[in-house]
Amino acid sequence: MMSVGIDCGAKTTKVVVVKDGRIIGKAKVLSGFDQKKSIIEAWDLALKNAKISADDVNRICGTGSGKNVVKFALPNTRDLANDIKAMAKGASFYFPKARTVADVGAEEGRAAKLDEKGNAVDFAVNEKCAAGAGAFIEAMGRALETPLEQMGPLALQSDKEIPMNAQCAIFAESEVVGLIHRMTEKQDISKAIHDAMASRIVSMIHGSESTRTW
């Protein structure tokens, strides 16, 4: 059985090729303005990495904020899964004993509680502010003149505790600017930013209350 999963997110599009429960190929590209083009680009690259052709694929499933575009780009797509279900099944695939999973996407953060079969039985989504999403880290990185990819490793160089109280990404950026003006080390600011996001995610996990069904 050859299956392909496509996650068309706000920032990146990811494709994974699975054969009999084993990942044999994958690819990731920037989503860009033309999501259809990004999906096809990631699809072609993943199939190339897996050393298979489109005719070898038995099943295609799409998820992510652009999941409806997946079916438009690849008409043979059979299934569309919402983000919570895909997150739960993905976490369970890698960590069968996991009962709590958090996913920080570019535009929103999500948390879910899983049962022993990897089904999400409770969940919460932060959709109101970028302060709980990857865009928050990216925006703070711009204030620090540091690329997103370097923010995590930079934070790991610090062991200081600097509280950030702002619950809004705009006000948080003002806090970061204030820390810069006080000559705070860049790695300490980066750690404070990550700690603030982690705190929001933990609060979301503890306060998860299912408000939607799928």
Where are these predicted regions, by residue range?
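Short glycine-aspartate micro-motif
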Residues: 3-7, 59-62, 99-102
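Short glycine-rich, Thr/Ser-proximal phosphate-binding strand/loop in the N-terminal lobe
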Residues: 3-41, 45, 122-123, 127-128
